[in-house]
Every structure is written in C-alpha cells, then in structure tokens.
C-alpha cells in the first residue's frame, strides 16, 4: 500500500516485492491516481478508499485474510481496513507508516499549505524535483515507464483530494481506536519526515505490542534496506503460521 504521491507503486516497490515474491504472493495496490490506474475527481474519504481496494482484490479472485503493508500515509487506510474488515487482516507490516498519532499536530492551515505547494509544482512542472523516483531493480523499459507515470500522475486531483481529506480520515480512524493484530513496524531515521514521526511509531508499536525495527535511512526504507526487510518479514510471517 503506497503513501501519498507515490507516482508508480508497481515500480517504486519492485526492489522489495521481487524478493518477497519468492516466498509469498504479493499484490501491489495502485489506487486511483496512482500508477496505471485511472485519474478521476472523487471524494477521498477513507471508507471509500478502503472499499475500492477491497472490491478490486475480490474481482481478481483474491480473498483475505491479508497481511497489509502500508507505506507512509496509507497507514491510515490500513488501520481503517482493520476496523471495517477485521477478518480480512491477518497481520500488519508498517513501512515508516503514519497513524493518527502522526497527525496530532497537523492543522487545516498545514494541509492548505501542502495543497498550495502541490498546485504550484503542477503549474511549473516541478514533479522532477518534488517527486524523485527510484530506478532500483528496474529494466530500461520500466525506467521509461516510471518517468512517464511521474509526469502523468504527480500532484493529480486524486492526490490533492487525499490531502484535503486527511484530517477527517484521521479523525474517523482515531474515533474507533486501534484493533490489535500481529504487527511488525519498520521505522526510518526520521530525517525525511516530521520531527515527531519516529516517536509516534514507537508509541504505536507499543500500543500494538509490535516488533519495531529502526534503520538509519530515509523515509522510503525499501529503497535502501530491501534485503534486511525481506529477511525480517520472512521471520515474522513464519511465526504467524507456527
């Protein structure tokens, strides 16, 4: 599950899922406005986001329970999935994920500033600067596709609507509390995220009694530590099936 503005999840996460796919069936979700999915103007409330993903998986013949692995902002969607469809979630693996705790200091003004920056970047075509992409593990054609999708998807209306809805979505999740399940949390060094991000993940891991693994690297942990993550995920899942 990709975070806000990841222009091509199928390519961004490839460096990790090609390793995991040797042992597991892995599905990369590309939400509306992401990757090769359609771009459309729709209300991005968290219940709609989650239900669309659930229906898409079911149409593919994929049924839970799933092990959800959200990156960044999609942590809110994963937590809502656990609330709405608890039988669908076997476990949670957080990839520098957000929780309601992360947004505790966010204000409407902060969200508005983010949206203004997105609109500014769109107007002046600054996607190459504000949406850096990783070419790790990609073929020549995939690198071209990744750049094409960045140009197509960066700061589109779906991303803007998600940002507009984030505080309301957080409030919905927060109001219903955290559902307990087996959890593994990967945490970055926090240098590319808000100052309190790391502490929030520590607190969240404590609430879920989750194993917390910290890496001295940037927010897109899978770009830097895919080998280490893969080993830890295999150990974690092995314990689930014992």
What name fits each language-model region?
Residues 1-36:
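Conserved HGGG/HGGXW glycine-rich cap/lid loop of the alpha/beta-hydrolase fold
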Residues 28-69, 85:
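Active-site loop/oxyanion-hole signature of alpha/beta-hydrolase fold enzymes
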Residues 66-67, 91-93:
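Residue in the alpha/beta-hydrolase core beta-strand immediately N-terminal to the catalytic nucleophile
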Residues 70-74, 78:
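Gly/Ala-rich beta-loop-alpha elbow adjacent to hydrolase catalytic centers
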Residues 78-82, 94:
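Short helix immediately C-terminal to the catalytic nucleophile in hydrolase catalytic domains
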Residues 93-122:
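Flexible "cap/lid" loop of the alpha/beta hydrolase fold
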Residues 139-208, 213-216:
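Conserved serine/cysteine hydrolase catalytic core
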Residues 217-228:
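Catalytic histidine-centered segment of alpha/beta-hydrolase-like enzymes
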């Amino acid at each position: 599950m990709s975070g806000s503005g990841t222009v091509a999840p199928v390519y961004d996460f490839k460096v990790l899922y090609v390793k995991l796919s040797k042992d597991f069936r892995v599905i990369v979700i590309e939400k509306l406005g992401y990757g090769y999915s359609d771009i459309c103007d729709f209300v991005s409330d968290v219940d709609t986001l989650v239900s669309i993903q659930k229906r898409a998986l079911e149409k593919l013949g994929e049924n839970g329970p799933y092990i959800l692995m959200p990156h960044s902002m999609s942590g809110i969607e994963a937590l809502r999935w656990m609330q709405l469809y608890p039988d669908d979630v076997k476990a949670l693996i957080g990839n520098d994920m957000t929780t309601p705790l992360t947004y505790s200091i966010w204000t409407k003004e902060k969200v508005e500033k983010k949206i203004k920056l997105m609109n500014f970047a769109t107007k002046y075509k600054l996607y190459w600067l504000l949406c850096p992409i990783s070419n790790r593990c990609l073929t020549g054609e995939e690198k071209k596709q990744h750049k094409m999708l960045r140009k197509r998807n960066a700061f589109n209306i779906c991303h803007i609507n998600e940002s507009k809805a984030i505080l309301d979505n957080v409030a919905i999740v927060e109001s219903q509390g955290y559902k307990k399940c087996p959890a593994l949390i990967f945490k970055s060094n926090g240098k590319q995220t808000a100052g309190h991000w790391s502490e929030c993940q520590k607190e969240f891991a404590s609430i879920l009694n989750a194993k917390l693994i910290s890496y001295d690297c940037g927010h897109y942990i899978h770009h830097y530590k895919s080998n280490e993550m893969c080993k830890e995920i295999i150990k974690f899942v092995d314990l689930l099936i014992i």
